[in-house]
Every structure is written in structure tokens, then in C-alpha cells.
Curated annotation (Swiss-Prot):
One of its GO terms (molecular function) is serine-type endopeptidase inhibitor activity. The modification N-acetylserine is found at S1. It comes from the Eukaryota. Belongs to the protease inhibitor I9 family. GO terms for biological process: vacuole fusion, non-autophagic. InterPro entries: PBI_I9, S8pro/Inhibitor_I9_sf. Gene3D superfamilies: Peptidase S8 propeptide/proteinase inhibitor I9. Specifically inhibits an endogenous intracellular serine proteinase (proteinase A). This is Serine proteinase inhibitor IA-1. Keywords: Acetylation, Protease inhibitor, Serine protease inhibitor. SUPFAM superfamilies: Protease propeptides/inhibitors. Coiled coil: none annotated. PANTHER family: PROTEASE B INHIBITOR 2. It comes from Pleurotus ostreatus (Oyster mushroom).
Amino acid sequence: SAGKFIVIFKNDVSEDKIRETKDEVIAEGGTITNEYNMPGMKGFAGELTPQSLTKFQGLQGDLIDSIEEDGIVTTQ
């Protein structure tokens, strides 16, 4: 996989579109590990394939608000 990412949708994206996007992640071989559905924050965390990641980067600003790597932050 390309790695673990947190994908946050824009506020006006429909529930159907979000569900469809998550289904695509799974169909392409990725996994959904967490879902966020709060006012002002709709999205999911999961492992994305390089194919899904590239596609989502292309949707940024349109459907997707942000894509962040879901890494463990360590401080020295």
C-alpha cells in the first residue's frame, strides 16, 4: 500500500458520495480503519493503494478537503 492516510471530505459532500468513495478504496485493495462523521469533519482513515492516493490527490479541492499521512508523531 502507499501507506496510512486520513482523508477529510469537504463539508458539502453527500453521504452517498462518501460511501461510494470508501467502497472504491476497498475495491482497489485498500482498507478503512476509522470513520469520522462529525459536524465539520467527515472522512476516514485507512490504508490506501498508490492508485487510490493518486486519484484522491486529483480530487483535492473538489471533493476532498485534505489528505494527511497517518503517522505516529515522535518527538526527540
